[in-house]
Amino acid sequence: MITLTVPDPAAVVAALSDPPVFSVSIIQTKPGKFDEFVALQHEQFLRVRGQVQGVRGSRMLQSPAKGVVVLISSFDTAQDAERFRRDPRFTEHLERVQPLIDRAEAMPVELAYEVGLI
């Protein structure tokens, strides 16, 4: 698990002033490829962390027994999310992980409710 530092209070206040735009990806890895996929995801996270304008944050949930990863990303705006999807750092990463994926679905989602911090 990777632990990050808390951003400065001004950044938190600015981020909370407008609701984020969310994207969720559900990824089923090919048999025997889960660990390799997760390792590449961690490398990508470290590569782009704090480098992409408009990205508020992300979470990766994993189910090793099922070979499934759920990625949740939040962006300042829908335009920021689209810009990220076209960013060469992202498209090149997709090319690297594509051979490890059995199936994947990505979708924009809206916050229905929120309780506590996750």
Q: Which ranges hold each PLM region?
A:
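Short S/T/G/P-rich N-terminal loop/turn motif that feeds into the first structured element of a domain
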Residues: M1-V69, D76-P88, R96, L100-I118
